[in-house]
């Protein structure tokens, strides 16, 4: 069974850079560490830009399946996590639903929320990376803007806190300091035995 470490945050937080950046030092310590890219990117390239909250279900299922299939490795570092899909669905809640449509949305959200909560236990360490660290252009697939990323950031943060998810919020800004901070947390948590050379 692998050690599973997830970096979660909105677009522009730098979570992918951090997830990729922590893998190489672990490999140099002879740890079988693998970076796992967010399956939602592949889904959106295949299906086109996000258009309906029900798309969060296949994204959740594909991400969960990927998380299970990679377990033969020693150490997995993700730039997202399956449970994030519930925060996305909450963020994508349409504001102009009639009563029947609202009931359908609430049913779907409760279902995905329950599945997402169960997946949280899959991870030994979660890093929350706040947005706003890097300037945003338009994402070619999600078409995020600054205010949208900030809104998702608030929803995701609230989701973690509401479910008492244990996570470490990355505080550093400089990339080397961030990697040092992350590796210190991994060592303190007993997930690595020594600090890598950064």
Regions found by a protein language model. Name each.
Residues 12:
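Walker A (P-loop) phosphate-binding loop of P-loop NTPases
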Residues 18:
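Hydrophobic positions on the alpha1 helix immediately C-terminal to the Walker A/P-loop
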Residues 15:
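Conserved lysine of the Walker
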Residues 165-169, 176, 180-198:
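C-terminal accessory "lid"/substrate-recognition subdomains
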Residues 7:
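Hydrophobic anchor at the beta1->P-loop junction of P-loop NTPases
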Residues 92-174:
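A glycine- and Lys/Arg-enriched "phosphate-lid" helix/loop adjacent to the NTP-binding pocket
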């Amino acid at each position: 069974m692998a050690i599973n470490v997830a970096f979660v945050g909105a677009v522009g937080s730098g979570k992918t850079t951090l997830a990729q950046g922590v893998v190489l030092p672990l490999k140099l310590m002879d740890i079988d560490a693998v970076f796992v890219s967010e399956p939602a990117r592949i889904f959106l390239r295949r299906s086109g830009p996000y258009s309906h909250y029900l798309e969060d279900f296949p994204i959740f299922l594909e991400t969960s399946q990927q998380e299970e299939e990679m377990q033969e490795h020693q150490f997995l570092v993700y730039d997202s996590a399956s449970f994030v899909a519930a925060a996305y669905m909450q963020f994508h809640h349409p504001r102009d639903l009639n009563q029947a449509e609202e009931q359908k949305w609430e049913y779907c959200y409760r279902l995905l929320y329950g599945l997402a909560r169960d997946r949280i236990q899959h991870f030994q360490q979660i890093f929350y990376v706040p947005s706003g660290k890097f300037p945003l252009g338009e994402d070619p697939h999600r078409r995020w803007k600054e205010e949208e990323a900030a809104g998702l950031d608030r929803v995701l943060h609230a989701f973690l806190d509401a479910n008492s998810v244990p996570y470490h919020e990355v505080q550093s800004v400089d990339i080397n300091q961030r990697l040092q901070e992350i590796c210190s947390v991994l060592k303190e948590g007993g997930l690595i035995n020594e600090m890598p050379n950064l």
